[in-house]
Amino acid sequence: MDISISWVVIIVSVLSYLILMDKWRAAKLPKNIPPGPPKLPSIGHLHLLRGGLPQHLLRGITQQYGPVAHVQLGELFSVVLSSTEAARQAMKVLDPNFADRFVDIGSRIMWYDSEDIIFSRYNDHWRQIRKICVSELLSPKNVRSLGYIRQDEMASLIRLFESSEGKPVNVSEEISKTVCTIVSRVAFGSAVKDQSLLLNLVKESLRMASGFELADLFPSSWLLNLLCFNKYRLWRMRARLDNFLDGFLEEHRVKKSGEFGGEDIIDVLYRMQKDSQMKVPITNNGIKGFIYDVFSAGTDTSAATILWALSELTRYPEKMAKAPAEVRESLKGKTSVDLTEVHELKYLRSVVKEALRLHPPFPMTPRLCVQESEVTGYTIPANTRILINVWSIGRDPLYWEDPDTFNPDRYDEVPRDIIGNDFELIPFGSGRRICPGLHFGLANIEVPLAQLLYHFDWKLPPGMTAADIDMTEKTGLSGPRKNPLILVPIIHNPTS
C-alpha cells in the first residue's frame, strides 16, 4: 500500500512539474500568437505527427486552424506557414528576419557543422559561400558551358535504354546513376569510380537526417541527448562520407585539374581557400560540406523530379502524348537536345513545373525567425522555428483548380514562374535563401526529360494499367518515390 502511494506521489509530482513548465513557457509568449490544436503536457503536439509524412500531417493542422498555425514540438515553439501570403511575408517582406536556419542534430553532423550553404546560419560565411556559388560555380553561363557533360551522359543512358527496348527497366536506378555521374563530373572533374557507394551514402544519410529527433525537441534534456542513438549512427555515416570525400579530394590534389584541364568546383574552392582576401577562411570541412550539398541537393532532387514527371505522364496518357509530340516536332531530325532548345519547349517546361508543384524537391522549407515579427496579423516570437509547407501551398485550392490533378495545361491560362517570384509555386524557395543551384538543377531535369521523351515511347509493363502506378512518397528531405519506377522503352527516334 505504501509503495502504491509512493508511486502515485511521484507520478503526480512529475505531471505537476511538466504542467508548470508548460505554463511557464506559455507565459513568456506574446498574446497574439498563431492558433494551434490543444496540446499535451511536455510533448505538446508530437502525438499529432505520428503515422504519416510531416508535410501531410501539418497540412491537416493548418486546414483546421488556419494557414498560419503554431505547433509545440516538445520544448520548441514552432510555426507552420501554409499560404502564399504567409510565405510572401516571411520570404520577401520580412526576409531578413526569416533568412536564418535552425540547426538540428542531423544537419549539424551530416552538413559539417553547418559550414555548407544549405544549412549555414545567416552570417558572413553564408554570404561569402553563396557569392562564390552564384558567381563562380553555378551561374547560368557556367551551367550552359557544362552542357557537353549532360550530352555525354544522356547519350550513354539512351544507348542503354535502346539495348533494353521492349523490356521492363528500372528507370529510377538508371536515371539516378546518370544524374549522379553528371553532378560528379561537374564537382570533381571526372566520374565517380564507386558511384553506387556514393548514391547509397547520399540516400541513406538523407533518410537518417530527416524527421524529428527527441533530443532536438527537448534540448534541455542531457539524458535524451545521451540516449539519441540515431546521433551515433549519423556520426558513423559521417565517418564513411569523410573517408569517401577525403579520398576524392586527395586524388584531385594529385591530378590538379578537371576534364580537359578546366576548373571544376573543387578547383575553384581550393583557389578561394588560398585567397588571403577572403573575409571568412574556407576550411576543408567547408569544402566537403559544399560538395555534400551539391550531391544531396543536386543528385537526389533532380532524379526524383524526372521520375515524378515520368510517373505523372504515364498516369495521364493524353499528357504523355502531348509532351513527346512537342519535343519531336521542335527537334525533328536531331539526335540530341541541348539547353537552348529546351527553353523553347513550352509544354515540356509546364510538365516540369507541374511535377515540381505536386512533388517539390524540398516539401518543407525550414527557417528561423531571429526577431519578433508579425505575419498575417499574428506575432511570431524571436527564435521561433518556422516550417514553410511548400507541398501544401502547391495544393491550395484557393490558387489551384483541381489541385491534386496533374495538369500542365493550367499554365497556359495563368503562367507562373518557379524562380521565387510567384509564391503559389516555390519549389526552390524564395528570397535570400532561394536555392543557389536553381539553374543547374533545372538543366539537369529539363534536358534529360526532353531526351527521354524525344527518343522513346514509354509503356507500362505487361499486365499493368495507369491505376496500378504506385505514387507513394518516401520519407526524406527530397520527397522521392517510395518504390522504383519500372517502364518499358520503345524506340521512336534512334540515336543512329
Curated annotation (Swiss-Prot):
Protein's UniProt keywords contain Iron:
yes
Q: Which PANTHER family match?
A: OS06G0641600 PROTEIN (PTHR47953:SF19), OS08G0105600 PROTEIN (PTHR47953)
What this protein is called in its record is Cytochrome P450 71D179
Its biotechnological use is: The monoterpenic phenol thymol is widely used as a fragrance and a flavoring ingredient in food and cosmetic industries. Its derivatives have also several biological and pharmacological properties such as antimicrobial, antioxidant, anticarcinogenesis, anti-inflammatory and antispasmodic activities. Medical applications include the treatment of disorders affecting the respiratory, nervous, and cardiovascular systems. It may also act as a growth enhancer and immunomodulator.
Annotated organism of origin? Origanum vulgare (Wild marjoram)
Q: Which UniProt keywords apply?
A: Heme, Iron, Membrane, Metal-binding, Monooxygenase, Oxidoreductase, Signal-anchor, Transmembrane, Transmembrane helix
Q: Where in the cell is it found?
A: Membrane
Where is it expressed, tissue-wise? Expressed at low levels in flowers, leaves and stems.
Q: How does it sit in the membrane?
A: Single-pass type II membrane protein
